[in-house]
Amino acid sequence: MAQTTKHIVVLPGDHVGQEITEEAIKVLNAISSVRPNVNFDFQHHLIGGAAIDATGVPLPDEALEASKKADAVLLGAVGGPKWGTGSVRPEQGLLKIRKELQLYANLRPCNFASDSLLDLSPLKPEIVKGTDICIVRELVGGIYFGERKEDEGDGVAWDSEKYSVSEVQRITRMAGFLALQHNPPLPVWSLDKANVLASSRLWRKTVEETIKNEFPTLTVQHQLIDSAAMILVKNPTHLNGVVIANNMFGDIISDEASVIPGSLGLLPSASLASLPDTNTAFGLYEPCHGSAPDLPKGKVNPVATILSVAMMLKLSLNMTEEGIAVEKAVKQVLDSGVRTADLRGSNSTSEVGDAIAKAVKEILA
């Protein structure tokens, strides 16, 4: 069988970013050890605070150019109090790479990697059992990229929210595609604030028309964002399916959802530049948690980053079997009790990574 090389740019970022990306690479190397026809080529570059310290900018040109040429990008975490809220901030590197690479769709699953984790949720197990939501957030438009005015001494500041029909159609098509990958198709929920905001009224109208005209077998239900935030806590399974939201609403609701499984260290994410209809969409993959500057070395949970690699394998690298194997390995390891402290365990970051890598080899052997 012909040798295939997958080119992956690794952006460890700040604080725990280095540790978690090392464990993710460990799992990918475990795959190549039992799939000799596949080789992973890793290129490491700076982003965030580490890049500011070394180069003065949060996203060096060489990191961006390398990312553009890669099959996928693996990101650790960026930010920390060291860099404050000055004019040059680590988070600017994230916003820039999303915009430059046109990573318009952020996918954040909210589910339980194993039912053995149900007791860790801040909600009652009987309420959260069966939660299976994929939040699809529009990532390169809206208020985060709109015109703005800072307070220049006059005591006035403002931000603007703007969406076009084409932007809303594009993210709706992503949600529709993902819903159709299941049999029966998943329901689609669209979150907005159409009772107040003009941009939300355009959003709702465009989502409705796009689903009706292009995905006639799907159902779409519209929910006001504040109501959805309450439902997510009271009865999260009610929102099971694909949830679509604009940039700011998606940012907030996905962070709320991330608390349901009991630890931010469990949840992966993917940011895609196109539909994964051939399993080769270009994407950036990262855990949902931050850089955890106060966490001692060896304590961070690598599961979210490793599950992000599972998404990468399935959506960008056309290695669905291997991606599923990683998910199975994570479940096996968690069920065996090998866990970091955030999951009431006593294992180190590298011990969890070692156990998952070993399980992946056994599953694929």
UniProtKB/Swiss-Prot annotation:
Cofactor(s) the protein needs: Mg(2+); Mn(2+)
A single GO BP: L-leucine biosynthetic process
Gene3D superfamilies in the cross-refs: Isopropylmalate Dehydrogenase
UniProt subcellular location: Cytoplasm
UniProt organism field: Maudiozyma exigua
Described purpose of this protein according to its UniProt entry: Catalyzes the oxidation of 3-carboxy-2-hydroxy-4-methylpentanoate (3-isopropylmalate) to 3-carboxy-4-methyl-2-oxopentanoate. The product decarboxylates to 4-methyl-2 oxopentanoate.
Record-annotated site: Important for catalysis: Y144, K193
Record-linked SMART domains: Iso_dh
UniProt xrefs under InterPro entries: IsoCit/isopropylmalate_DH_CS, IsoPropMal-DH-like_dom, Isopropylmalate_DH
Name of this chain's protein: 3-isopropylmalate dehydrogenase
Residues at which substrate binds: R98, R108, R137, D226
Subunit structure: Homodimer.
Binding site for NAD(+): 80-91, 290-301
Reactions the enzyme catalyzes: (2R,3S)-3-isopropylmalate + NAD(+) = 4-methyl-2-oxopentanoate + CO2 + NADH
A GO cellular-component term linked to this record: cytosol
The protein's enzyme class: oxidoreductase
